[in-house]
Structures are given as C-alpha cells and as structure tokens.
Amino acid sequence: MRQILVLLLFATLVYGLIRVPLKRQKSIRKTLKEKGKLSHIWTQQGIDMVQYTDSCSNDQAPSEPLINYMDVEYFGEISVGTPPQNFTVIFDTGSSNLWVPSVYCISQACAQHDRFQPQLSSTYESNGNNFSLQYGTGSLSGVIGIDAVTVEGILVQNQQFGESVSEPGSTFVDAEFDGILGLGYPSIAVGDCTPVFDNMIAQNLVELPMFSVYMSRNPNSAVGGELVFGGFDASRFSGQLNWVPVTNQGYWQIQLDNVQINGEVLFCSGGCQAIVDTGTSLITGPSSDIVQLQNIIGASAANGDYEVDCSVLNEMPTVTFTINGIGYQMTPQQYTLQDGGGVCSSGFQGLDIPPPAGPLWILGDVFIGQYYSVFDRGNNRVGLAPVVPYPPLKNGV
C-alpha cells in the first residue's frame, strides 16, 4: 500500500506539472563588459564593487539592488492581455510583483523592448493606482493594470500587474528581458498586488501549491532549464530533497548554518539568514565576509568585476554552505563564470542589507544551478537536492 501511495504521489508531481522552458542568454554584465562600459555603469550608479549597501529603510518602498539583475541569464516567456501580447521576463523569487514596459513609457530602455498596449486588449481594466520600485539609485514607476496573464498555457484571470512608464538609468537598455514576474510572498508586493502564483493557487490552476526551478550551468548549451508549477520533477535531481523551513515569509528566507572554506568554518559561524533567489545570479553576502572570501579564492578587482585566472581553478578552495545540517559544496568550476580569453569572474558579490531585513546571504543562480530548488507555499519550506545535469532530457521534455 505504501509503495502504491508513493507511486501515486510521484505521478501527480510529474504528470500534473506545468513546465515553463527557461532560455539562457547573455547577461547585462557580460554585455556591458564586452562594450567596455561596466566600470562606467558602476560609477554612474554610485556602486563600490568592494562594498555595495542596499540602503532602503523601513519607510521607503522595497528596494531591489540593481546588481542583483546584472548577471541574470535565465528568462521565460509570458503573455498579457486578449489577444496575448508576449514578453520575456525574469521569474524572480526575490520579488513579488509582475511588471512589463508600457507603450506610454518614454525611457530608452522601454523603446528597445516589447511594450504592453492596453488599448489592444479586450480584457484590460485600469486599476487607477500608481506603483514605484527602487532599483539601485533609480526607480521604476508606472501604473497598475488588471488583465489576463498566460504562463505556458496557464491562464490567470484578473491579474494585477505594473505597466512601467519610466525605467531607471541606462542599465535596462542592454537587458535581454522586458519585465519581471515575482514569485515571492505577498507581504513584499508593492501596491497590494496579489502575486501571480497566489492567483494560480486561488484559481485552482496548479495541482499543488509549489513550484520548482532547474537551471543548466553548461555554458555551451542554449537550453537554460525549466520552471515547474504545481510540484517538482524527481528526474531532475539525485537523492532526497532536504526540506528547509522558511524563517520569514517575504523572500524565500531560510536558516544558513555556516559557510566553510575547505571544510573550515570561516563565515556565519553562529548561523545566519539566507534567501534562495532566482532573480540574483551570483551568491552575495556581507561585504566584509565577501572581501575576505575573494582574497581567499584569489579574485582581484579588474574591469569593474572580480576576476580569477581560469588556469588555476583546480588550485582554488571548495566553498560549502551548510543548510539544515547538510553541506552544499561549490567547487571553483561551479562558483566562477567563464568570460573567455582565460579569464573567469568570481561568482561572489558583496551586498550589505541593513536590519531589519538583513544582514542576508543570497543564494542566487550560481547556487541554484547546482542544487534543484523547490518552493513549497503549502508548507512554507524550500527543498534542495543536487541537480542531474543536462543532457539528457527524458521524453523530449
């Protein structure tokens, strides 16, 4: 009987899944670096590569550090309106709002991306409210609309979303994405908007109130991975999921036991907080810790980045994040990014998030690419397990 129940559960988790393909494309940082503009952008944004502080206080709108999106390479497709208007978005567990550029946006970034035209949608309604999101030293602002949103065949009715009419600076001009679809908790949503996934649950569009993320770190593969709504796919990981309780229902925040270098605890020795964030490509932590970590791995600041010689990766240490008693190892090949020409970028970035939200470590795509991640809203927990790398994919999925 127990085997039958396990098989039934597995069938539900696999065959009731809605799979959203993720494509992998060039990040903003890599594009700017190739153009020789990266250092200029840091200067323009007032960002110190050694120490970046998210200075948003309690009485300000929620802040999204601009550097979080500089290295994002994984994107998916959604549509808004009737008939559907298509957009490329970041599926971001570190925020909770959906926004896309508006046809009324006058910023340079909007002009080079797909823009939503409300007058062409028969199901569009105006909310009448404005919204604003902080990104680094600038803000993205616009109005809130209501319309149908489709994600890989899932039709979400009456979804509130932001229509941006102003986007900050020049950074988003080089972005491969049009907008962002937040998958965080409702408590961090701007404008009292109900997040897309919450509406999926409320409208009975998913089998289970959970979603999961698989990311390929193979630089030679155009296949980025997949976002799965309604459960998880056990063929994408090995072993058992380590279920970790969410400690604060805003971000997908969990307890981090410690951070080890070659088996020695050097950071977070008394335990600290971390978030699992698909909208942040790198692994970030308090700047004082990250400066020390960069020195240990031999990374040095150059060209607006932290770089290491790719030829010495085998001599660099292993970094381990201990979560719920289990060590999640990251080899040098896993925590660095190959830029070409024998140069690799460090996958670590300093980011000081002040109380009460911080301090926080952020386990971004560099980490998620090695560990399949399940986000369970029904039980408020995150599941982690080692990925089974691409290829192969089963049944052509």
Curated annotation (Swiss-Prot):
Signal peptide: 1-16
Gene Ontology terms for molecular function: aspartic-type endopeptidase activity
Residue pairs linked by disulfide bridges in the UniProt entry: 105-110, 268-272, 310-344
Tissue spec. comment: Expressed predominantly in the larval foregut and the anterior and posterior adult stomach.
Active site: 92, 277
GO biological process: antigen processing and presentation of exogenous peptide antigen via MHC class II; proteolysis
Subunit structure and binding partners: Homodimer; disulfide-linked.
Protein's job: May have a role in immune function. Probably involved in the processing of antigenic peptides during MHC class II-mediated antigen presentation.
Listed name of the protein: Cathepsin E-A
Protein's organism: Xenopus laevis (African clawed frog)
Higher taxonomy: Eukaryota, Metazoa, Chordata, Craniata, Vertebrata
